[in-house]
């Protein structure tokens, strides 16, 4: 046995080997030490022919799933080596084989997975300058493939799918991509596979064979060279780990990244699409607001909608039409919710069925779900529109499968397939016959008691007992003190220290009656159950199509319900480039606040004179909430959802970028400012004129002059249609940036309205035209509870600093790329020289002369502020 264990372990070196021995899975040597430590199990030893005992630990086979899941969540792979023949029939050592390898991306245990989230396994192939990306969820049978031509686009797909496991070729692993970040920060198990997985010659053959097509054209893969290799490698990996035909993976869906709105990882995090930034909880996210789904399939589909909004107007309008229909038919909508509620996870149930791991109770759950389908299809007849028609066409009520299960499986069966009592009476004649024999078994059991009494009386052995174990069956046990009274017709079966065990012809006959019929009945029920399960598995394509239709209905019913409950409006979708939101509200914040009413606000952006809105105002006033709500309303509209507003006219955007807040990235050694600049650089490099940018406090992570210079230059760059020209909401504390409204045609100033009451302020949360006249920082500090002594000192200091404001100097900065009429060159006597010092005037003639020589009309904003910074340092150094 140990020799076979070592041979098997050699084949699965990278796995923890669960080796079945009787009623336990045992681990040996280093595996035992690892499992003992990770799962806090007792480490024992076993004699294995070596000088020292082999370290060993084990878990009961009936509880193994829980232990396996804990190991997989810690990043381990687990190979399950099972007994594949009946130990009673084995000649010599019981035959064992690895029946499955469980990895983070191939785990199909429904108890350990989040039912509302897909469990994706991704394969990445890097060849030349392209990345092939194949992604599957083995629990649902979904299989996608695409290609991208940059690392940034690859990371966008990575963030969109959020896989739990990545397999890749060696060139990708060594390409410089931050593998450690994927493993540690993102929690993804990443491994490079041997080169044979990625052979070009076998790739095409693998795909054609699995999907039963004659050419790659039949799969839509003509232009996916890297994608073909990635898809084939992923299938090979699944064959190796799952040890089955993968009959639940029936369709490969190529897609172009241009089909969906692009949202990078930072923006997903900042907008809190599916989880909150700090707590990583669903509550408080956009998904939390929208998700009123009743099924696991619907919850997963809605999540995918939120993570990949559409950019195709026609597809968006199809979704809108169905939501409108469901809104208008409230009774139909509520009846659909009633019938959707009892439906189990059909996608994952059919995978368990095809993997032959579904138990009798899974089959009853499946049957109960199928009973809900006919009334749902009847209700679908009331819905109009192209999308509703398409759903109806793919909606199969599966009555034949439901009838099979109702006639064959007991309503309350055991979990184990080996416990019997699975098959209904009347389904199979032989089962019925053997069940009738069971009545005789009960009588036979009474006969055992009768036989025991009769033998005691006949032999005079008062402590004679009839007992049973799996090895010897039924036997008569007599203690040594009475063995001299044993009659000749007793046949000895076993000698113990203090007793003898015997068999008689009459007892043997009873044993055959009892055990033979029970074993035959259990075995027959097991065989029939497998046949029924296989019949269901043969219909996997029908079941998956219906499961997807159910998921779609669930999603649109949910979106319609949310729209009605929250007074959302139907947005107008177009390609005009205009975003015009009246009375917009933040979908999450309005649900979270309890005592206050949410203040709505308007947003207007276009591709001409209203391209950039510069928003000023104090902290806590609501700038970030306003900008996020605008982005979320656009995103919701492109999901197809209704939106929280009085009205909305949404010109489709291809990307949403946000740069909202930052913190030090200590793990990678990056400061707050470096994190901020990396995000800004990504936006400026990858945004287009059709993108929506949400920028909050650009430049705050460095000195005032540097920060203002960068913020100014960024606004200039974005506003220039030849460079970018994207629609932008730009919040800032640099009030000097409001000067750009008069210098750049596409820039407009807005601020958060504030009401002053003496030294106190009230945030009105309303966006109004114009720039803020001051920041109210001291008032905000007072609201936050800063000690009064500090507040009073701050007032003194701000009064001194206000005399040395740089605003007047900023007014005279030229704007890059503007007509000469926009530039202003001040006379020397117009310049307030006190601005060059924070607390006193400047009397140094050489500095004044240097200032006279500066030609402001030929300086960029960055040059001007750098010069100002240089002169200020000279003054400081002389004090």
Q: Which sequence ranges carry the predicted segments?
A:
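Hydrophobic alpha-helical segments characteristic of transmembrane helices
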Residues: 337-340, 346, 364-367, 543-552, ...
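Extended active-site and interfacial segments that coordinate phosphate-rich ligands
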Residues: 32-51, 136-163, 484-515, 595-605, ...
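ATPase nucleotide-binding head domains, primarily ABC-like/P-loop NTPase cores
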Residues: 29-32, 224, 294, 305, ...
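Active-site phosphate-binding and catalytic loops of NTP-dependent enzymes
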Residues: 81, 104-113, 245, 384-387, ...
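Alpha-helical heptad-repeat coiled-coil segments that mediate oligomerization/polymerization in large
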Residues: 528, 532-539
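Amphipathic heptad-repeat alpha-helical coiled-coil/stalk segments that mediate oligomerization
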Residues: 198-206, 213, 261-262, 368-443, ...
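Charged catalytic and DNA/RNA-contacting regions of genome-maintenance
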Residues: 1-325, 341, 345-354, 358-450, ...
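C-terminal tails and terminal domains of large nucleic-acid-associated
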Residues: 837, 841-879
């Amino acid at each position: 046995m140990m020799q076979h264990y070592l041979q098997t372990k050699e084949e699965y070196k990278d796995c923890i080997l669960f080796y079945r021995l009787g009623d336990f899975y045992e681990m040996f040597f280093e595996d035992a030490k690892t499992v003992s430590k990770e799962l806090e199990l007792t480490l024992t030893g076993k004699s294995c022919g070596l000088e020292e005992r082999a370290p060993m630990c084990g878990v009961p086979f009936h509880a193994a799933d829980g232990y396996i899941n804990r190991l997989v969540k810690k990043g381990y792979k687990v190979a399950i080596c099972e007994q594949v023949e009946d130990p009673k029939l084995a000649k010599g050592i019981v035959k064992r084989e690895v029946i499955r390898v469980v990895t983070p991306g191939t785990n199909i245990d429904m108890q350990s997975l989040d039912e509302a989230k897909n469990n994706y396994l991704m394969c990445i192939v890097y060849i030349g300058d392209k990345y092939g990306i194949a992604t599957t969820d083995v629990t649902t049978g979904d299989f996608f493939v695409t290609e991208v031509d940059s690392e940034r686009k690859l990371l966008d797909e990575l963030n969109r799918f959020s896989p739990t496991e990545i397999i890749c070729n060696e060139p990708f692993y060594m390409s410089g991509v931050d593998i450690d970040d994927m493993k540690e920060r993102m929690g993804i198990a990443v491994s490079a596979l041997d080169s044979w997985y990625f052979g070009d010659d076998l790739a095409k053959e693998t795909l054609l064979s699995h999907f039963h097509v004659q050419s790659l054209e039949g799969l839509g893969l003509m232009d996916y060279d890297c994608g073909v290799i990635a898809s084939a490698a992923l299938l090979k990996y699944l064959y190796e780990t799952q040890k089955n035909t993968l009959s639940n993976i029936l369709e490969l869906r190529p897609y172009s990244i241009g089909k969906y709105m692009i949202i990078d990882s930072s923006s997903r995090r900042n907008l809190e699409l599916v989880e909150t930034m700090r707590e990583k909880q669903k509550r408080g996210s956009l998904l939390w607001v929208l998700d009123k789904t009743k099924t696991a399939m619907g919850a997963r589909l809605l999540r995918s909608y939120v993570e990949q909004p559409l950019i195709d107007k026609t597809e968006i309008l199809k979704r809108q039409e169905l939501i409108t229909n469901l809104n208008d038919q409230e009774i139909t909508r509520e009846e659909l919710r009633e019938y959707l509620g009892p439906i189990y996870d059909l996608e994952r149930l059919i995978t368990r069925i095809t993997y032959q791991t579904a138990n009798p109770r899974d089959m009853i759950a499946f049957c109960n779900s199928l009973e809900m389908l006919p009334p749902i299809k009847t209700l679908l007849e009331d819905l109009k529109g192209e999308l509703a028609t398409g759903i109806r066409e793919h909606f199969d009520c599966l009555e034949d499968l439901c009838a099979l299960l109702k006639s064959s499986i007991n309503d309350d069966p055991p979990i184990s397939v080996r416990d019997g009592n699975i098959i209904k009476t009347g389904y199979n004649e032989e089962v019925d016959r053997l069940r009738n024999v069971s009545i005789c078994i009960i009588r036979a059991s009474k006969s055992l008691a009768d036989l025991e009494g009769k033998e005691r009386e006949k032999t005079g052995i008062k402590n004679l007992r009839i007992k049973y174990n799996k090895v010897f069956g039924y036997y008569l046990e007599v203690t040594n003190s009475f063995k001299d009274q044993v009659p000749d017709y007793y046949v000895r079966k076993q000698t113990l220290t203090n007793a003898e065990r015997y068999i008689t012809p009459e007892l043997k006959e009873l044993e055959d009656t009892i055990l033979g019929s029970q074993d035959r009945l259990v075995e027959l029920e097991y065989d029939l159950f497998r046949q029924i399960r296989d019949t269901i598995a043969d219909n996997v394509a029908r079941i998956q199509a219906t499961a997807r239709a159910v998921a779609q209905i669930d999603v649109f019913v949910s979106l319609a319900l949310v729209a009605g409950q929250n007074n959302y409006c139907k947005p107008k979708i177009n390609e005009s480039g205009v975003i015009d939101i009246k009375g917009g509200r933040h979908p999450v914040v309005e649900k979270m606040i309890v005592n206050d009413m949410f203040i709505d606000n308007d947003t207007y952006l276009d591709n001409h004179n209203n391209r950039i809105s510069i928003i000023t105002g104090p902290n806590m006033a609501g700038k970030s909430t306003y900008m996020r709500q605008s982005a979320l309303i656009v995103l919701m509209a492109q999901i197809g959802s209704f939106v929280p507003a009085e009205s909305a006219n949404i010109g489709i955007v291809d990307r949403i970028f946000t740069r909202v807040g930052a913190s030090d990235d200590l793990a990678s050694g990056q400061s707050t400012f470096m994190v901020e600049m990396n995000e800004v650089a990504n936006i400026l490099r990858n945004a287009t004129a059709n993108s929506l940018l949400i920028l909050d406090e650009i430049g705050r992570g460095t000195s005032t002059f540097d920060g203002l210079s960068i913020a100014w230059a960024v606004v200039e760059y974005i506003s220039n249609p030849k460079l970018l020209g994207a629609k932008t909401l730009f919040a800032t504390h640099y009030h000097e940036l409001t000067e750009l409204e008069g210098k750049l045609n596409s820039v407009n100033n807005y601020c958060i309205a504030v009401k002053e009451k003496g030294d106190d302020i009230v945030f009105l949360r309303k966006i109004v035209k114009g720039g803020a006249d001051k920041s109210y920082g001291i008032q905000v500090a007072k609201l936050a509870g800063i000690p009064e002594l500090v507040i009073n000192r701050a007032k003194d200091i701000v009064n001194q600093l206000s005399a040395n404001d740089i605003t007047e100097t900023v007014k005279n900065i030229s704007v890059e790329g503007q007509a000469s009429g926009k530039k202003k060159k001040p006379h020397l006597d117009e310049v307030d020289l006190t601005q060059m010092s924070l607390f006193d005037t400047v009397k140094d003639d050489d500095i004044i002369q240097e200032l006279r020589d500066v030609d402001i009309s030929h300086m960029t904003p960055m040059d001007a502020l750098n010069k100002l910074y240089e002169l200020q340092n000279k003054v400081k150094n002389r004090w």
